[in-house]
Amino acid sequence: MATTNQLIRKGRTTLVEKSKVPALKACPQRRGVCTRVYTTTPKKPNSAMRKVCRVRLTSGFEVSSYIGGEGHNLQEHSVVLIRGGRVKDLPGVRYHTVRGSLDCAGVKDRNQSRSKYGTKRPKK
C-alpha cells in the first residue's frame, strides 16, 4: 500500500486498454478492397477449409478478414465492409466481412439467423 506522500509524489498510473481491432480506428465498420481471397486450415483440434480474404482498408491497414456463411462471391478487387470479431481457430484473423453489403452478397437459401448473413426475407 502506498503512503499519502508517495501518492502525492508519483500518483497512480492508469492502465491503458489496448484495442483488439486497431485497424478500425474506433469506427464500427470499415470499407476495404480485397487483395487476395483464399482458404486456410484452422488450429489443431479442428479441421476445415476456412474462407478468408486479405483486405486493404481505407484506414491504410491491410488485414485478414473471415468470410462467414456457405459460399461467397468475393474476388480480388471486390469492395467489402469489415467489422471486428476474431475467429478463435484462425491465428491472425481478427475481423469479419459483413455479408449482404457492398460487393459481398448475402448467403443464398438461408432461413435462420438471416440478419447475420445479409439474406432477405423469403417470399411466401
UniProtKB/Swiss-Prot annotation:
GO terms for cellular component: small ribosomal subunit. Signal peptide: none annotated. SUPFAM superfamilies: Nucleic acid-binding proteins (SSF50249). The keyword Amino-acid biosynthesis does not apply. Keywords: Methylation, Ribonucleoprotein, Ribosomal protein, RNA-binding, rRNA-binding, tRNA-binding. GO terms for biological process: translation. The keyword Ribosomal protein applies. Pfam families: Ribosom_S12_S23. The modification 3-methylthioaspartic acid is found at residue 89. GO terms for molecular function: rRNA binding; structural constituent of ribosome; tRNA binding. Part of the 30S ribosomal subunit. Contacts proteins S8 and S17. May interact with IF1 in the 30S initiation complex. Belongs to the universal ribosomal protein uS12 family. With S4 and S5 plays an important role in translational accuracy. Interacts with and stabilizes bases of the 16S rRNA that are involved in tRNA selection in the A site and with the mRNA backbone. Located at the interface of the 30S and 50S subunits, it traverses the body of the 30S subunit contacting proteins on the other side and probably holding the rRNA structure together. The combined cluster of proteins S8, S12 and S17 appears to hold together the shoulder and platform of the 30S subunit. This is Small ribosomal subunit protein uS12. It comes from Acinetobacter baylyi (strain ATCC 33305 / BD413 / ADP1). The lineage of its organism: Bacteria, Pseudomonadati, Pseudomonadota, Gammaproteobacteria, Moraxellales.
